[in-house]
């Protein structure tokens, strides 16, 4: 009876150890995914800033052109 209990306990402990190992691998994968997503997010933010600045420049140029057109029409 005691031997059976010890074998059951050993089996449960081994299952727990295996589960912990799998969870640790999953955590590492998730950390890597998080790093990739963080880098991608930073790239997208930089691209957004660049595009916003470019948009503002074009708006300024267009406003200047509209102003010149209005001056010539006056």
From Swiss-Prot:
One cellular component term from this protein's GO annotations in UniProt: cytoplasm
Is the keyword Coiled coil in the record? yes
Q: What is a biological process (GO) this protein takes part in?
A: division septum assembly
Q: What is its main location?
A: cytoplasm
Entry keywords, A to Z = Cell cycle, Cell division, Coiled coil, Cytoplasm, Septation
The family annotation for this protein states: Belongs to the ZapB family.
Q: What does this protein do?
A: Non-essential, abundant cell division factor that is required for proper Z-ring formation. It is recruited early to the divisome by direct interaction with FtsZ, stimulating Z-ring assembly and thereby promoting cell division earlier in the cell cycle. Its recruitment to the Z-ring requires functional FtsA or ZipA.
Tell me the protein's name: Cell division protein ZapB
Task: Give the originating organism.
Answer: Psychromonas ingrahamii (strain DSM 17664 / CCUG 51855 / 37)
Q: Gene encoding this chain?
A: zapB
């Amino acid at each position: 009876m005691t031997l059976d209990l010890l074998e059951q306990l050993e089996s449960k402990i081994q299952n727990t150890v295996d589960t912990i190992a799998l969870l640790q691998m999953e955590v590492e994968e998730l950390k890597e995914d998080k790093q990739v997503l963080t880098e991608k997010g930073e790239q997208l933010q930089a691209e957004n800033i660049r595009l916003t600045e470019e948009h503002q420049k074009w708006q300024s140029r267009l406003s200047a052109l509209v102003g010149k057109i209005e001056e010539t029409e006056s």
